[in-house]
Amino acid sequence: MKILVSNDDGVLAPGIKILANELSTLGEVKVVAPDRNRSGASNSLTLTQPLRVKQLDNGYYSVDGTPTDCVHLALTGFLEPMADIVVSGINEGANLGDDVLYSGTVAAAMEGRYLGLPAIAISMVGDNIQHYETAAIIAKQLVIKLSANKLPSQTILNVNVPDLPLNQIRGLQVTRLGTRHSAEPIIKEYDPRGRPIYWVGPPGIEADAGAGTDFFAIKTGHVSITPLHLDMTHYKLFDHLSNLLNEICIEN
């Protein structure tokens, strides 16, 4: 098996090394990841300048681009032969609910799926993460399962793991995305010359976090596994929207 590993925390982040080491027992692992932390990069591609790649002493490839750049680069000619699966992570921090819209970790997995491969995004939930090995072992088991049981097209798995020893994990739960309240206000500060600068505020607190959500699974000590679909079309709105549009008169 050939496994492509990427992330958004950067090629030197602890999570990616632990993940790659664990997956190496399944086959050939190639790591292609950003040269620095690119959290929040979402699905952005670098289109206005070339990408530069450096191979590190450990064999990992460091790219001066986004997580999506890394996977796109790896799967469209940089790496031969083609990988069999993409695993993105292990992210230092949650990717729950609305987080998936901004997450570079999830975006890297999405890019793999766009390019035809099964893909998993995996994140640790907590501060000052201590138990990356837990997520790595779970990722390995999921890769084994997906190698024998293919996901439907345009589907990835978004996996969130509590920062606990493996023997304290209460099980795996299939979940839906919860939601957060709106983000906190921006944080205004001043640079040494007295000019205003702005930081994006913290994410909003949980809004929809009841039973069945990814938030709830984590709170109860479970691993959350959310199947995400890349087709964002809202099919149930077709009839209602068509009726609204029929009321619009467009004259030449």
Curated annotation (Swiss-Prot):
It is found in: Cytoplasm. It catalyses: a ribonucleoside 5'-phosphate + H2O = a ribonucleoside + phosphate. Keywords: Cytoplasm, Hydrolase, Metal-binding, Nucleotide-binding. One of its GO terms (molecular function) is nucleotide binding. Nucleotidase that shows phosphatase activity on nucleoside 5'-monophosphates. This is 5'-nucleotidase SurE. It comes from Legionella pneumophila (strain Lens). It is an enzyme of class 3 (hydrolase). SUPFAM superfamilies: SurE-like. GO terms for cellular component: cytoplasm. Its cofactor is a divalent metal cation. It comes from the Bacteria. PANTHER family: 5'-NUCLEOTIDASE SURE (PTHR30457), 5'_3'-NUCLEOTIDASE SURE (PTHR30457:SF12). The keyword Iron-sulfur does not apply. A divalent metal cation binds at D8, D9, S39, N91.
